Amino acid sequence: MCGNQRERGEGNVARLNSLFGSHGEYTDTSIYGEYRAVERLAGGRLSTLYRGEHVQTREVVAVKVLSDYGCQVANKLTQRLGKPWEGERASKLQHPNVVRTLAYGKAHDRYYIVMEYLPGGNLAGLLQMHSPAVEGRKIETMRQAARGLEYVHSRGVIHRDISPRNVMLAADGTAKLIDFGVSISKADVVLKRGLRTGRPGYMAPELIRDYKYNESTDIYAFGVSLYYLATGQPPRQTSEDPFEALAMVLNTPIPPPRSVRPTISPRLEKIILRAMEPHPFARYPSVTRLLDDLLGVTDADL
């Protein structure tokens, strides 16, 4: 079960009758503060995501509900770092390219976060489907994601889980960074062992060796995302064994993007490889500098 957290946005609403019995985890129509979960969209070990609505205005939203295990992870991070959990951190981030957090709290013994609803899907899925939503505007989508990350860093936050799965599109096609569940402030970059987070294929080498998080590790993960966007495949083969996957990052050279897809321009390849330099001091010193170079390329460079 979740620990205590201050509730936000609790309205005078009642729990309703069963709705999600076929989905397993929740056996009643779940009310979270002033919002109601309507349709299960996705789920994993840490959380379940629902399409929801405001009980009075019917505004469509996304409701993220942490599982018991997700609550344990959130409590562990809060206790180890002495910092607010995801809802409180994310609610302070206000930028056109960062998902808006509308409310957060605890209900039914679980933490929840209410966010703006992004119906456009995530970038990873859109790329796999060759969706018209991103075809012809892949670079612009990543530029927008970079603007969001630039802002996040300016607010003293390190995302720690940058990947195409965590870039989603709004109805008008605007790209937004999502999922600040493992984000951390710059003041807490010296972490105790055992708190390494993120997807192995997107982890910078120094993170695997030394558990060091900073803006540069986000830049590396952004570079991996650019590589995937440009070539249609990850820079390294993946492994279901997490230790083997981490070893690949340290020991397997990155094939130059143009060796995978010769149509990629040399200038775009240069941007990708600089963002993914094994040594952090050889990477872009900031997302701002990376964004400056991205302004000089288009989808014609793919």
Where on the chain are the PLM-derived regions?
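AlphaC helix of the eukaryotic protein kinase fold
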Residues: 70-92
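Conserved short submotifs of the Hanks-type protein kinase catalytic core
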Residues: 108-122, 126
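Protein kinase catalytic-loop region centered on the HRD/HxD motif
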Residues: 147-157
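Conserved activation segment of eukaryotic-like protein kinases, specifically the C-terminal portion
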Residues: 193-206
